[in-house]
Amino acid sequence: MVLTDGAAIPAAPFFWYAAGFTFGRSGATVWAMPLPVIAHLDADAFFVSVEQACDPSLRGKKVAVGGRQRGIIASASYEARACGVYTPMATKLALQVCPDLILVSHTSGRYGQFSRRMFDLCGTLTPFVERSSIDEGYLDLSPCGCGTEAELVNRARGLQRRLWEELQIPVSLGLAANKLVAAIASKLLKPRGFVVVPPGTEAEFLAPLSVGVLPGIGKKSEAKLKAQGLTAVQDLLALNEEGWYALFGHSWRDIQAMARGEDDRPLKLEHDDAKSYSQQETFPHDVSDFAEIERIAKRMIDELMPKIRADGKKVRTMTVKVRYPGMEDSVAGRSLTEATDLEAPFYPLVELLLRRAWAKRRPLRLVSVRFSGVDDRPAQLEMFAQTEEKKRRLAAVLDKLNDRGRKAVVQHGHQLGKTTAD
């Protein structure tokens, strides 16, 4: 890999980037700037790494975790990726492109256990940890009390080494002033990468990188942009407002901010071992419009499900509660046959549960939605899993687009109607 300054990145696991310098070994230079205190941790080929930790004979081999027959590949080792295996890919096709691929069936419960142990170790470095998915998370390193970048780098690298020594899980780390840049940095030199972006150099760091590093720009969008000569992030920044709007519509300002490396999202510190997920809304005045209550309940589904996905969980049961004036509550619930982390299966239940819970049809003071029956087992990899995986990947893209502390960039149709006062 070569940046625009012509400096090649050496093939070693720990490197950092500083403005005015090429990639080099961390700790080699001191910069007189605030410290980059947000770290993004990204486990390398997590499912495969867990299986290799449990069976070291799999290390260094072309390995994939996936379902057999009509299943899909959930994770592939870097050796397998070099042969053309990717995620998600039909198992049948993966075995065609890589005949000597070692296929390992997923092990129920194992990945959640390793994930919890991984984030428990992160908690020994800092109490401020956000688990964004089963194999990724953010750390606020400001409580570490580091006075220099060398101390900060040593602490972070120490965590990286400890995760390998105690769990045999390789991870990549990105350090920056905000979550967006830290996440991009962590993926730049995988596997076992270590990249530091000093505060104030975010735009310079992103400028030569492919437009595809920005959240929300998938492979199809990236191909369309490159067909128009917009290859690197710096090409986007050269556009005027009309050009931005033509490409991205009303969300152009958010994507422009990302291209500049701007991100003010705080860490979300919810507990990741939740047994249920719930949200409620109390109205400033009593509400009797069924369609409005239904829209609010569906919006709660849309806001809760990204948290469930981020925790690597699925849920089976949805309960709707309504409250009449005078603190009188009424509830109704229904369970799916299979746990899920997608919104769509629960939408049809909203009207049914509301009609049951709201049998008296008096004006309401409050409505709440609660998900329970939490399941942290890995996704089913057989049968119709390819369709489910596509939906899950789309949901993950929407989560990243909307997780910017502003108004949602992408909304479902039921979110576009009448709104109530917050």
What are these regions (language model features)?
Residues 338-422:
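Acidic, metal-coordinating catalytic segment for phosphate/diphosphate chemistry
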Residues 175-180, 261, 314-325, 364-375, ...:
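A glycine-rich phosphate-binding loop feature that marks nucleotide/adenosyl-phosphate handling sites
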Residues 44-46, 69-72, 325-329, 374-377:
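Short, charged/polar surface micro-motifs in flexible loops or helix N-caps
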Residues 137-143, 331-334, 378-384:
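Short, hydrophobic beta-strand segments
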Residues 14-257, 306, 388-422:
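Gly/Gly-Pro- and Ser/Thr-rich, intrinsically disordered tail segments characteristic of DNA damage-repair
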Residues 31, 213, 221-364:
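DNA-contacting surface of Y-family translesion DNA polymerases
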Residues 2-19:
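Positively charged N-terminal leader segments that act as targeting/secretion signals
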